[in-house]
Amino acid sequence: HGHSLLSNTKNEWRNLRGTRISMIFQDCGGTLNPIRKIGSQYVEYICTHTDVSKAEAWKKGCSMLQKMRLPDAENIMKSYPHQLSGGMRQRVGIAMAMTFNPELLLADEPTSALDVTTQAQIVRQMMELRDDFGTGIIIVTHNIGVAAYMADQLVVMQNGKVVDQGTRDEVMNHPTSDYTKKLLAAVPEMEGQRYV
């Protein structure tokens, strides 16, 4: 079904990145050019990877922003990054990452810079996109609640080494390493239940 990426040429990697494999960064706002409007950047991104007109790319960008439940996608496309909230910029980044229905999405702390309410919305939207497009997601997070909610499989790392791995239920309910046990014990309790 798959093939090794280890022997890919630079050109093969270029064709994969942004289309079949995509990335959401911790601060998507930092990856956006501050002196270019969102629409200009989004249209360029789409046109770089496809043979569509700028008008078609604009429509596709608006459609993806609407899927991320951003109000008034046309207005967002006409905005500069600094005119959007952190949550809105993060949604723009996720929309861009999902534009080509990637097979694999890498998400590096995609919610850590956001308030709790926005975090929950972003996580739900990522899972909806996963379900809609059949995208596999590898998420790097320090948030045990996000990991417990999103993951089918968990890998716990300490100092760059794997110390626990398995299904979500195996790792959450039967951790094997002391490190994982300490992480889980540090999760706050509410009415006698761990808050994950």
Role assignments for model-derived ranges:
Residues 99-103:
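A short, proline-enriched helix->beta-strand linker immediately N-terminal to the Walker B motif
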Residues 147-149:
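A short, surface-exposed alpha-helical micro-motif characterized by mixed small hydrophobic
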Residues 4-22, 40, 48, 170-175:
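ABC ATPase NBD coupling module
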Residues 120-133, 145:
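Helical segment within the ABC ATPase nucleotide-binding domain
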Residues 165-166:
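ABC ATPase "signature
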Residues 56-75, 184-185:
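Conserved ABC ATPase "signature" region
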